[in-house]
């Protein structure tokens, strides 16, 4: 017989965190949920359509009292106490944008600063694109498209900041915090691509022996540098290569800061190359573009690895593997535990670690002391949500 238990020793009326505070008691709380499977003595056969063929444990005859409005009883798709008047399919894109704009205007200082930075970049890129089209200068048009794409990524970061404030629902039971991790990963991926493109541009300049800068590109680089330096000052608290991420928004803020820093380095590289060319230094453009490419790559790689690890549900980096192994040895050493069959731990977002453990225990034991012990062991490591499955020998 198997039993799967999501265990928490706190009182029944105390929620583990704020993820269920808006949906009522036990809306997405699995502490008291369990499932059983029985080994049948007979072989496989075609089930008969009779009353006796119904499952031994049936949801319709469950003795667990569920609060109203948590599960639908009329076949509709309304769950977790959302109310039947909510229809997400009818929400228009304009209403969603307006809602996000309202959250931004009433949000924290970082969100308002990012909104101002995006507005400045949009104004500058639009002006640069217009001048490039009317004057026929392809360099300005190309740089304007680069800035526009960067504005799109910053807008996605702002959207993630606003949306992550939404409370969990039936579709996203863990909430929307991971959207900020996805936004940070997208920014890091874009910067990695920018580093690669700069390296290709440097190689092309070396092969073609192009060593001439146009003055209007220098003016564009100086203006872009000034705008990005304002963004660096806005997010100066995250102007580091390695950061201990304690929350999902730390990753997002860090990615925004690295985005504007990388753009600033790119603009500074163009200005430096033009100055060196004016001094008669050969291959100055190749040298500067190569240095910028390597610098951006080294800046972004730690963020790229951290966000990718969270999205791939890697083992939590804040918990040493030796500590997890020690906990497994402590659990296995108990007399009522035969074997630890499976142990999985990962981060939903930075600061929220979950785990799943499958234990083989001796039949006829009292599970409560064992569950309490296992919970205490992993809770001390920082595992917030722990699901246990027990198999009897």
From Swiss-Prot:
Compartments, record wording: Vacuole membrane
Sections of the chain in a coiled coil: none
Principal location listed in the UniProt entry: membrane
InterPro entries: Cation_efflux, Cation_efflux_TMD_sf, Msc2-like
Example GO molecular function: zinc ion transmembrane transporter activity
Domain of life, source organism: Eukaryota
Role of this protein: Involved in sequestration of excess metal in the cytoplasm into vacuoles to maintain metal homeostasis.
Protein's name according to its UniProt entry: Metal tolerance protein C2
Gene: MTPC2
């Amino acid at each position: 017989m198997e039993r799967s238990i999501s265990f928490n020793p706190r009182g029944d009326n105390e929620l583990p965190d704020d993820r269920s505070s808006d949906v009522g008691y036990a809306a997405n709380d699995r502490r008291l949920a369990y499932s059983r499977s029985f080994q049948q003595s007979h072989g496989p056969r075609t089930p008969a359509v009779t009353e006796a063929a119904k499952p031994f444990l049936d949801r319709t005859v469950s003795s667990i009292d569920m609060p109203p409005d948590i599960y639908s009883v009329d076949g509709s798709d309304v769950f977790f106490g959302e109310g039947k008047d909510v229809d997400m399919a009818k929400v228009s894109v304009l209403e969603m944008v307006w809602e996000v704009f309202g959250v931004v205007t009433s949000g924290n200082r970082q969100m308002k600063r990012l909104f101002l930075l995006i507005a400045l970049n949009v104004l500058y890129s639009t002006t640069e694109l217009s001048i490039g089209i009317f004057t026929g200068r392809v360099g300005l048009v190309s740089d304007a498209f680069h800035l526009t794409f960067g504005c799109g990524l910053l807008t996605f970061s702002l959207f993630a900041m606003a949306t992550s404030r939404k409370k969990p629902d039936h579709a996203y039971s863990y909430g929307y915090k991971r959207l900020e991790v996805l936004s940070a990963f997208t920014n890091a991926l874009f910067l990695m691509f920018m580093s690669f493109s700069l390296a290709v541009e440097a190689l092309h300049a070396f092969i073609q022996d192009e060593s001439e800068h146009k003055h209007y590109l220098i003016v564009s680089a100086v203006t872009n540098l000034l705008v990005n330096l304002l963004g660096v000052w806005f997010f100066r608290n995250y102007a580091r290569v390695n950061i201990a991420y304690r929350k999902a928004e730390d990753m997002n803020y860090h990615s925004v800061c690295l985005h504007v820093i990388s753009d600033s380095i790119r603009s500074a590289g163009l200005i430096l190359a033009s100055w060196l060319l004016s001094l008669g230094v050969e291959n100055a453009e190749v040298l500067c573009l190569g240095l910028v490419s390597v610098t951006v790559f080294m800046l972004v790689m730690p963020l790229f690895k951290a966000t990718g690890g969270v999205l791939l549900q890697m083992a939590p980096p804040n918990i040493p593997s030796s500590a997890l192994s020690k906990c497994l040895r402590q659990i296995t050493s108990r007399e009522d535990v035969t074997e630890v069959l499976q142990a999985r731990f990962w981060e939903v977002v930075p600061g929220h670690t979950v785990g799943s453990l499958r234990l083989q225990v001796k039949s006829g034991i009292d599970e409560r002391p064992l569950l309490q012990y296992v919970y205490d062991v992993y809770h001390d490591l920082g595992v917030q949500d722990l699901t246990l499955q027990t198999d009897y020998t």
